[in-house]
Amino acid sequence: MGLSNDRIKFNVGGRIFETTATTLANAGRDSFFGALFDENWNLSQPGDLFIDRNPDCFAVLLDLLRTGDLNIPPNIPERLLHKEAMFYGLIDHLRTAKWGPFDGNRLHLSRSVTGIAPGDGTAIRAGPDGGCCIAHGSVVHVFDWMLEEHPTINLDYQRVNDVGWIDSGNIVLSACERLGRGDGGMGLFSSSSGELRYKFQVSHDNQVKSYSAGALSFSPDSKIFTSCKGRSNEYGIGVWDQSTGKQVDFFYESPGWSLGDADKLQWLSGKNCLLVATLFPRKDNCYISLLDFREKNMVWSWSDIGFLTMAEEKRVRDAIAMEESNSICVVNEFEDLGFIDLRMDGGGSSVRWSSRSRLMKSKMPDEPCYPKLALHEGQLFSSMNDSISVFCGSDWVLTSRLKRSYGGSICDFSIGGDRLFALHSEENVFDVWETLPPPII
């Protein structure tokens, strides 16, 4: 490396590059270039520096540091550029330049991935770094943010009920117990190798029991929640510590209420409670409750028992809590949105349906999928058939809709890592939606 004032020269694969210390400092302390600076961000002088790497990729990455813009010539494979970015510690810079901060109203279809499994998908979950995982029966396919598939996780004919990310390197799977086998439950797997790292056990009366694990949720204080079904009416919500893997609590299901069969769990940080929703058609009736594990108390509950005088279309198919408005949003099979008031026990015993949200006037497909809900940074998302609707504002006005031309109905979708992933039912395909990076002014 040669120094002339603020100018720096590199020999990369036989090509000479000249840049400035200011440009290199944009790479950050943890990068390859960050090691060239002392603790006060003054450049050290190791002499001439030869880097035996690809010069074409180096030129792209240097331009990225200089301008913040990513321009990839057609002769450079993206896989090679990603590999070089990892060497220089610039993978986060590259990812940030490829797509911008998530905005449901500015999403565009970036890519569709096909042919990953036979049969219908169970769930798709977005990872924290832009990757995803997909459960198909007893198999889970894992993709990194470059959408390259990692080794498959196979549970040997145990059906996977749910899957969730602890962090970019670890995935939790919940599975059914197989009759007479004593397996099932919940396990922690490596996202990169598919290796089982830990199996979470459940104990009742100080005895380890077999169980089926269902819906998953995670809290910021490193707790894992899952709905549990045991053999001796041991139904309820189990709680484990992510760090130790040990069970720390269990909320037992009371007679006349449903917890162990829950379709959805959601941790509410503001209320320090867990939302538990058991929905039709898993049960004949819908049960939604908030559990406070500090007091072992169900602090709020709602059910449609005794209130089903309405048409079948008013059955609740998904639910999500909205803490800022003290309400729970629900959706029926025609994408009518409904709202239940959390400030009243039992929600006032009724759902305030918003008929103006009904969007799908066309004929239902042969194999419709139940609608799903998601809430992300003040935007509400609802899937219906082959599209996803985006609602915004205090009145939840429809502002945009995501739709592609093939793949069939959307059976699940997930938001994370500044991406939206949509899993289709009729074809082995999932879509990746991204927000375009802001223009360079």
From Swiss-Prot:
Keywords: Ubl conjugation pathway
Metabolic or biological pathway, per its Swiss-Prot or TrEMBL entry: Protein modification; protein ubiquitination
Domain BTB: start-end pairs: 6-74
Full protein name: BTB/POZ domain-containing protein At4g30940
UniProt remark on domains: The BTB/POZ domain mediates the interaction with some component of ubiquitin ligase complexes.
PROSITE patterns linked: BTB
GO biological process: protein homooligomerization; protein ubiquitination
Pfam families: Beta_prop_At2g24240, BTB_2
Stated role: May act as a substrate-specific adapter of an E3 ubiquitin-protein ligase complex (CUL3-RBX1-BTB) which mediates the ubiquitination and subsequent proteasomal degradation of target proteins.
Keyword Glycoprotein: no
Signal peptide extent: none
Organism: Arabidopsis thaliana (Mouse-ear cress)
Domain of life: Eukaryota
Gene3D superfamilies linked to this entry: Potassium Channel Kv1.1, Chain A, YVTN repeat-like/Quinoprotein amine dehydrogenase
The keyword Nucleus is assigned to this record: no
Family annotation (InterPro entries): BTB/POZ_dom, SKP1/BTB/POZ_sf, T1-type_BTB, WD40/YVTN_repeat-like_dom_sf, WD40_repeat_dom_sf
